Amino acid sequence: MLPDQANDLRKLVLRAGRGGGLNDAPPPKIVVVAGGKGGVGTTTVALNLSVALAREGRRTVLVDADFAGPDVAGLCRIDEQYGAADVLAGRRTVHEVLQRGPGGIQVLPASRGLTDPSDCTPQAQERLIAQLEGLGPHADFVLLDVGSGTGRTMRRFWEAADAVLLVTHPDTVAVMDAYAAVKLVCQDNPLRGRILSLANCVPDAEAAADVHGRLDRACRRFLALKVSAAGELPFDPSVPRAAAEQHPFLLESPAGPAAAGMNRLAIEVPRLVEAESPLHTHFRRRAE
C-alpha cells in the first residue's frame, strides 16, 4: 500500500470510528516501547511508565502489541478475551475492548486471536492506528508495548509513533541488538518521531551515560539518526518481586530507586515527545 493510500484509509477508518462527526481534539501522543531483544523489560517499562504518566495527570492508554509474547493482561490482572487482535481483524473497536487497569490507566490487551502478526494486512494495521489516533478526546498518551518484534506490523507501529522508547540493558550484546533493531526498521522507512533510549537495570549513572552514548554514536555514524537519552532505571529487587505479584512496581514500592527513575522518566518523555521539530510537525500535518 502506498503512503497516500494508507493515509486516506486511516482518515476513512478514523471518521467511521467517530460516527462521521467532527472531532477537534488533538490526537494523543503515541509512544512505542521497544527492545532489541527479549528480556530487557519493555513490558515492565511500558506498564509502569503508563501508571507514572497517569499520576502526572496524563490520561494514558497502554496497548499490548507484543503479539508473540503478550504479558500486559497478566501483569494488570485483566481479562484478555478481546483486545488488539480483534481490532486488527475488525471484530471489535478500540472503545469496545479497552479495560480499566491499575493506577488509573486504560489497557488494550493483545487477546488470543493473533498468533502471527506478520499476517496483518496493511488495512488491518491502519485500522488499529486510526482508532488509536482517534482517542484524543479520552487520552493524552498511548503507549504501545511491541517487545522485540521487528516484523512488518511492528515496523508500521514504529513509523506511526511520535516517539520510540528503546529499552536496553548495559551489556554490549543488548546495545548492539538495540542498534540492529533501529537499523532494520529505519533502513527503508524513515520515522516521523524521535528515537529515545532508556538504560534499564544499570548500576549507576555513569553506566547509563555509556549506554546512551554508544547507541547514539552508532546510530549517528551509520544511520544518520539521533537517539536522545530519556533516562535510566537502576537495578531494584522490587521490580521482579512486583512482576511476580502481578503489580506495577511503581505502586508496590513507590519509594524505591526504580520508582524514582520511572517518575523522572514520566516527566522527561513528554518533554522530549512534545518538543517536535518543524520537520516532524510538517510531516505529521501532511500525514493527517
Segments (PLM) and residue ranges:
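P-loop/Walker-type NTP enzyme "switch/lid" segment
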Residues: 35, 62-137, 241-248
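NTP-binding/hydrolysis catalytic cores, primarily Walker-type P-loop NTPases
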Residues: 1, 244-288
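Walker A/P-loop phosphate-binding motif and the immediately C-terminal alpha-helix
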Residues: 26-68
